[in-house]
Regions:
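Glycine-rich GHKL/ HATPase_c ATP-binding element in histidine kinases
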Residues: 64, 124-128
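Conserved short strand/loop->alpha-helix "switch" segment adjacent to the catalytic nucleotide/phosphoryl-transfer site
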Residues: 18-48, 54-64
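Short beta-strand/loop element within the Bergerat-fold HATPase_c
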Residues: 63-76
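Glycine-rich/acidic phosphate-handling loop/turn and adjacent ATP-lid/helix
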Residues: 74-103
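C-terminal beta-strand of the catalytic ATP-binding
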Residues: 130-136, 143
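Glycine-rich ATP-binding loops of the HATPase_c
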Residues: 113-120
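Short beta-to-alpha transition helix within the HATPase_c
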Residues: 1-16, 71
C-alpha cells in the first residue's frame, strides 16, 4: 500500500535530512493499493518534493514543517500534496521552469497522468498539488517505460 511505503520514506527523510529535527516532516496518508513499481515511483516523487522543500523553504537555520498528504479528492482520484510553512517562492520565481528537480517531478507525475501545480500555501510557504489519476491502476509496460 502507498501509505505504508510513503510512511517509511518520510521517516527516513526525517531521520537523515531534517538537520536534527529543526524541520518536522508529517504524513497524512490514506491507504491506497498500488503495485510495487508504482510505490517506488511515488516514493521517488515524494522524496524529490520533500528534498526540494528542505533545500529551499528553510534558509538560515529556520525551523518549520513539511506535510505530505495522499488522499482521494472529491472525484475519488488520488491527490498528492506537499506543503511547507517556509519562506515560499519569491515574486517572479517559477518552480516549473527548468531546474532538474522540477523536471524530475514533472516526469514522475506524468507517469501517473498528473502534472504538478505550485501555489502559495495558506499561512505562508509553498504547496505542490499533483492529481494522480493513474495511481493504483494496473498498467502494462510499454517501450516508453523502459530506459
Amino acid at each position: 500500500r502507498a501509505d505504508e511505503f510513503l510512511a517509511a520514506v518520510l521517516e527516513d527523510l526525517a531521520e537523515t535530512q531534517t538537520d536534527g529535527g529543526r524541520i518536522a516532516v508529517h504524513g497524512e496518508l490514506s491507504p491506497i493499493e498500488v503495485s510495487a513499481r508504482d510505490a517506488t515511483t511515488l516514493g521517488i516523487l515524494v522524496g524529490e518534493l520533500v528534498t526540494n522543500a528542505l533545500k529551499y523553504a528553510f534558509p538560515d537555520a529556520r525551523s518549520g514543517t513539511i506535510t505530505v498528504t495522499l488522499a482521494p479528492d472529491d472525484e475519488d482520484v488520488p491527490m498528492l500534496r506537499v506543503k511547507d510553512d517556509g519562506v515560499g517562492m519569491r515574486e517572479g520565481d517559477d518552480a516549473t521552469e527548468s531546474g532538474l528537480g522540477s523536471v524530475i517531478v514533472k516526469q514522475l507525475s506524468g507517469q501517473f497522468g498528473g502534472e504538478p501545480h505550485y501555489a502559495p500555501a495558506d499561512g505562508g510557504g509553498l504547496e505542490v498539488r499533483i492529481r494522480l489519476p493513474e495511481l493504483g491502476r494496473t498498467r502494462t509496460t510499454t517501450k516508453d517505460d523502459i530506459l
